[in-house]
Amino acid sequence: MADEQLQLPPEQISVLRKAFDAFDREKSGSISTNMVEEILRLMGQPFNRRTLEELIDEVDADKSGRLEFDEFVTLAAKFIIEEDSEAMEKELREAFRLYDKEGNGYIPTSCLREILRELDEQLTSDELDMMIEEIDADGSGTVDFDEFMEMMTG
């Protein structure tokens, strides 16, 4: 359960703590599962009601109808992390499209070399060669979006 928490930055956990505390009116250390939807809505966090219900079921291990803070963070993190990764993929797709001038779904490794050099001017030619060799795993001399995405997200 704590895996998702590790992926959230401390400031995000702090925001979740404030929201949780505001809805934990009795200061019992837990909130009703009914309040989760309201908290996500107030935070401007998009969610699908059915997915939310399934996650509440999964996270509320003791089926108490209440979530402790850790359970709440685990649940909220699933929405936050998914949204962040979707946004990142969209941005990377746009960046890839800029370099894929012909629109054929790949960019030449020479273009990739320019991108890498812009990202880190300190790279030597040998380092660039090694990186490109690793990224262009199939040795095609081109990099498709999946290879590009893997490079950018590690």
Swiss-Prot record:
One of its GO terms (cellular component) is myosin II complex. Keywords: Allergen, Calcium, Metal-binding, Muscle protein, Repeat. Belongs to the troponin C family. GO terms for molecular function: calcium ion binding. Ca(2+) 1 binds at D60, D62, S64, R66, E71. Troponin is the central regulatory protein of striated muscle contraction. It consists of three components: Troponin-I (Tn-I) which is the inhibitor of actomyosin ATPase, Troponin-T (Tn-T) which contains the binding site for tropomyosin and Troponin-C (Tn-C). The binding of calcium to Tn-C abolishes the inhibitory action of Tn on actin filaments. Residues 11-46, 47-82, 87-122, 123-154 form the EF-hand domain. SMART domains: EFh (SM00054). InterPro entries: CALM/Myosin/TropC-like, EF-hand-dom_pair, EF_Hand_1_Ca_BS, EF_hand_dom. It comes from Blattella germanica (German cockroach). The lineage of its organism: Eukaryota, Metazoa, Ecdysozoa, Arthropoda, Hexapoda. This is Troponin C, isoallergen Bla g 6.0301. Pfam families: EF-hand_7. Ca(2+) 2 binds at D136, D138, S140, T142, E147.
